Amino acid sequence: MKATDLRDLTTAEIEQKTQSLKEELFNLRFQLATGQLDNPVRIREVRKSIARAKTVLRERELGINNG
């Protein structure tokens, strides 16, 4: 998910999205440990999506208006 898409969401929606991404990351890491992961690149994508969401939340806290 792109940062511009995240900026259109409400803070609660972003927090919910972050939580679901964290759960997905947990499941992906579990699959990696058990050798069942088909696409290891997905772990990186999910981590970056979490970082983007946290960045948008932090921008809102600081009052930065990017985008």
Curated annotation (Swiss-Prot):
Q: Which domain of life is it from?
A: Bacteria
Q: Which GO terms describe its cellular component?
A: cytosolic large ribosomal subunit
- Check the record and name the InterPro entries matching this protein: Ribosomal_protein_uL29, Ribosomal_uL29, Ribosomal_uL29_CS, Ribosomal_uL29_sf
Q: Which PROSITE patterns match?
A: RIBOSOMAL_L29
GO MF, one example = structural constituent of ribosome
Q: Which GO terms describe its biological process?
A: translation
Q: What is this protein called?
A: Large ribosomal subunit protein uL29
Q: Which family does it belong to?
A: Belongs to the universal ribosomal protein uL29 family.
Mind giving the lineage of the organism this protein is from?
A: Bacteria, Bacillati, Bacillota, Bacilli, Bacillales
Q: Which UniProt keywords apply?
A: Ribonucleoprotein, Ribosomal protein
